[in-house]
Amino acid sequence: MPGVARPPLPLLSLPLLLLLLLLPRAGRPLDLADYTYDLGEEDAPELLNYKDPCKAAAFLGDIALDEEDLRAFQVQQAAVLRQQTARRPSIKAAGNSSALGGQGTSGQPQRESRGRWRGRPRSRRAATSRPERVWPDGVIPFVIGGNFTGSQRAVFRQAMRHWEKHTCVTFLERTDEDSYIVFTYRPCGCCSYVGRRGGGPQAISIGKNCDKFGIVVHELGHVIGFWHEHTRPDRDRHVSIVRENIQPGQEYNFLKMEVQEVESLGETYDFDSIMHYARNTFSRGIFLDTIVPKYEVNGVKPSIGQRTRLSKGDIAQARKLYKCPACGETLQDSTGNFSSPEYPNGYSAHMHCVWRISVTPGEKIILNFTSMDLYRSRLCWYDYVEVRDGFWRKAPLRGRFCGGKLPEPIVSTDSRLWVEFRSSSNWVGKGFFAVYEAICGGDVKKDNGHIQSPNYPDDYRPSKVCIWRIQVSEGFHVGLTFQSFEIERHDSCAYDYLEVRDGHSESSNLIGRYCGYEKPDDIKSTSSRLWLKFVSDGSINKAGFAVNFFKEVDECSRPNRGGCEQRCLNTLGSYKCSCDPGYELAPDKRRCEAACGGFLTKLNGSITSPGWPKEYPPNKNCIWQLVAPTQYRISLQFDFFETEGNDVCKYDFVEVRSGLTADSKLHGKFCGSEKPEVITSQYNNMRVEFKSDNTVSKKGFKAHFFSDKDECSKDNGGCQQDCVNTFGSYECQCRSGFVLHDNKHDCKEAGCEHKVTSTSGTITSPNWPDKYPSKKECTWAISSTPGHRVKLTFVEMDIESQPECAYDHLEVFDGRDAKAPVLGRFCGSKKPEPVLATGNRMFLRFYSDNSVQRKGFQASHSTECGGQVRADVKTKDLYSHAQFGDNNYPGGVDCEWVIVAEEGYGVELVFQTFEVEEETDCGYDYIELFDGYDSTAPRLGRYCGSGPPEEVYSAGDSVLVKFHSDDTISKKGFHLRYTSTKFQDTLHSRK
C-alpha cells in the first residue's frame, strides 16, 4: 500500500545508510536534472519547474529523499558506518544489481517503491531539530496539474479537506508563494517528499491507480511531515517482521529507525494509522504476511494498513507537530455554531482557541455572535475574541471584541474566516456563542480566483440559487476555465444548471446554459465583467463544478509575439505558437521546422508516422489532408499500428476525421497495438492527425489510402430505400419490415419477426424513419446474457393515438413471447419511460391497423445487471457483465443478484471462471456473497484476484451476490453456475 510514516521528520537508521553509501551515484551533485518541467495544460507556454520525487536521490517505500540530507549524513557518520559494516557483513553493496540498483517504474498503489535505493544516506536529525521541514503556520499552498480529470481533482480536494477537518493544517490554492506542492502524474506512481523542502515547488506524484481517497490522504501525510509508522524504534514491541515473506530486494522498506532519529511526540504505537503498512505489503504472495501484530487489542489481533481515514493517533500527532491550539476546530459545514469553552458557565484563565471556518470557494460566510459576555478592558487587551477575514492569523482583522455588546454581523470577503479566543483571567461571565452560515454568490472584484458549486467536491445542496458577478481590472476580459463539471443531465438543462452571461446582469447576452458531465469549453467575455448563475432543484444532486476565473491578456500583441517564430495565437489565459503550411512546431513550441503530413490529392497512396520504420520522435504533430474528386469517398487501411497505449488515447494517438478541419466528424482516435478497422470518409476528404508526447515512443504506423466513386451520392444509386456504397460498386438495402426485390433496387414488404441476441442495439418500426405501413404486425424477441435484465429506452415515439391504444400500438412483454406478463402498451407522441424486464428476455409486438399511419418509434435496447433469479434442480448460469467473453467488465459497476431456491432447499454456487482485479483486502473490485436476501445476512466471503473460489453452499434458501468494480483496472470477470440443493450442511468460502 502506498505508505506514509507517522514519526514526523525522523531520518534513516545505520543499516539503511550502509546501503545508501555504497551506491555508485553517491557523489553526484544536485543539478537541474532533479527538476521536472511540466506544461500542466496541454498548450501552456510557460514551464512549471518543480522538485520531482521520481528523480530523488533515494527512496524508502513511497518516500522520496533528497541529496541535501544524504550528503550531510555521509560527512557526519562515516566512522559509525564502518563499525556498523563490520558488525553486519551480510549486507550487500547497493551496486549489486541483484539486490539494489536503479530506478523502477511501478505505478501500482500497492507497490509504493520502485523497489530500489539510489543515492546517499540522509542526515541524522530528530524532528524537532528540522523546523524547516514543517510548513510555516501549517499553511500548504498547492497546485493541481492540468493532466487530471475532474473526478480526480475532487478526490484531491476531499483528501485535503479531510486533513483540514481534523487538524490545524490549511491547504490553500497557490497565488504567489515560493514553496508549494504540485499534484502531478509521474511514472514512479505514488510518491512524495516528507515535509516541506523549501526553495520552490515540490511534486506529490499521484500516478496510475493512486487516485483513491485513502492513498491521497496517505501521500499528503508525507507532505505534512510523517514517515511510516512501522519504522518507529519501538516497533519490535508491537509488530513482527516476517522477513522470509518479503519480496527479494524490498527488505530495506522494513528497516527500523534509531531512537535518536525519530520523534514520535509521545504518542503510542498506532496499528490503525493510515501511515502503517498492511500485513502483506511487499509480500512474495498475497496470502503471506510481512508484518504481524504481536498482541491482541480488545480480544482480537488489530488490523493494519487501512486507507480509509485518519486514525485518532494520526490526528493527535499532526496536532502536536503543528502545535494546534488545545481547543477550537475546523468547521466545514454550510451552517454551524461554536462557543467559548464551558459556555455558558464561564471560561478559565489562559485559554487559547482557534476556529477555522472554511466553506466552498465562491461562497461567503455570515458570522453572528448571539451572546457576548467577556471581561471588558481597554482595547480588549486581556480577554477577547478576534475575527480575521481569511485563512490564518495574519489575515485582515475584522474586529476584536470583549465586554457585553454584541458585534454586528460579519460577512467574509472570501470563503474562510479565522476566529481566535484568548483569556487571561478567570471571569464569571458566560463567554460567547456564535453561529455562521455559508451564502453563495455575490460580487467578486479581483483579477483571478476560484468559484465552486456549494459543498464541492461533495454533492451540491438542493434548492440553491447562486449568482456571481465577476469583475476584473478595466481594459481586460474575463477568462473562465472549468476544472470539473458534473451537473444533473437534461436535454435543455431545465432542472440543475450553470448559466453564464456576457456582462453584469441577468439581461446580458447569454453565453450558455450548461449541465451534464462534459466540461464546457473555455469562456471569454467581451468586457471586464461576467455573470454566473447556478441553480439546483429539490431532487437529484451531483458533484457540481469548479471553475477558475482570471483577467485575460493578449500575449500575441507584445512586440516579440510571445517568442513565436512564425505565428502567435492567443488562447484563453495563455497563447500558443503555430507555423505556416509546410512547417510544424519544434520541441521548444516556439520555433518552426519542416513538417510531416501534407495536402494529398492522389486517388491512392500511403502515409507513415515520422521516422518509420524506426520509432517515431517525441513531441510530433503531423496532419495529412486527403482530397478526392467530388462524388468519391476515401478509405484508409492500416498495415501496421503501434503507438503508446492508454485507455483514452491521451498521450500518443492517430485521429481520423471526415473533413479537413479539427472539428470535422470524428471517425476515431486510436492508440496501442491493435490495428483499426478500415475507415471510409463521409465525403470526398479526410483528415489524419498523428500526435506524440515527450515520453514513450513506439514504431508508429503505416497505412495506405484509396479513393472510390460513391454511386450512392447521385439519385441514391437508384435504390428505393437505402443505398450503401461498396468498393468499386454499391448495393441497395431495405428497412425494417421490407426485403429487397429481385431487381436489387426496389423493396417489398416481408415477414416482420426478429430475434435479437446482441447486448445492445436499436429497434425501429417498419420503414423508419418514414411512416410505417398499414395492417402490419412485427415482433422482436430479445434475449441477453443470463443474470442481466433487458432494458428498453425510447428515443422517439409517434404512433396513432387512442386512450386505450386500441388502434396502432407497441406492446412490451416480460418474457420470451406474448404469453408473458405485459409491461406496457404504448401509442401517441409522448415518449414512454424506460421499460425494464425482470429477466434476460423481453418480447415486443408492434401492430398497425388499416387507417392512420405515423412515423412510428425508435428505441434502444440494453442490459442492466442484477435482479432476483430462481434456482432449481436444473443448472443455470450467471455472468458478471453482459459482454462477458468479448470485453472486460466495465468500471463503476455495482450489481446485486438474489438467487432464491424453493423452501427447504439451499443454493449451490460453482464458479467456472473468475478473474477480478487483485488487491490485498479486495477493496477495489470484488464479488461478495451473503447467506440470505440482503447484506445484513451472514457474509460467506469477499473474493478478488484470479482463479475460481471453491464451491459455496447456502444455509438457507437464498444467496445475495454483490459485484463491485471501481473506475480503473478491469478484468475478464466471472461466470458462475447455480442450482438448488438439499446439501446445506457444508459451507465452503474463502475470504
UniProtKB/Swiss-Prot annotation:
The keyword 4Fe-4S does not apply. The gene is Bmp1. It comes from Mus musculus. At high levels in embryonic maternal deciduum and floor plate region of the neural tube. Less in developing membranous and endochondral bone, submucosa of intestine, dermis of skin and the mesenchyme of spleen and lung. Its cofactor is Zn(2+). Keywords: Calcium, Chondrogenesis, Cleavage on pair of basic residues, Cytokine, Developmental protein, Differentiation, Disulfide bond, EGF-like domain, Extracellular matrix, Glycoprotein, Golgi apparatus, Growth factor, Hydrolase, Metal-binding, Metalloprotease, Methylation, Osteogenesis, Protease, Repeat, Secreted, Signal, Zinc, Zymogen. Residues 327-439, 440-551, 596-707, 752-864, 865-981 form the CUB domain. GO terms for molecular function: calcium ion binding; cytokine activity; growth factor activity; identical protein binding; metalloendopeptidase activity; peptidase activity; zinc ion binding. Its main location: Golgi. It is found in: Golgi apparatus, trans-Golgi network; Secreted, Extracellular space, Extracellular matrix; Secreted. InterPro entries: BMP_1/tolloid-like (IPR015446), CUB_dom (IPR000859), EGF-like_Ca-bd_dom (IPR001881), EGF-like_dom (IPR000742), EGF-type_Asp/Asn_hydroxyl_site (IPR000152), EGF_Ca-bd_CS (IPR018097), MetalloPept_cat_dom_sf (IPR024079), NOTCH1_EGF-like (IPR049883). This is Bone morphogenetic protein 1. Binds 1 zinc ion per subunit. Residues 26-125 form a propeptide. GO terms for cellular component: collagen-containing extracellular matrix; extracellular space; Golgi apparatus; vesicle. Residues 116-127 have a biased composition (Basic residues).
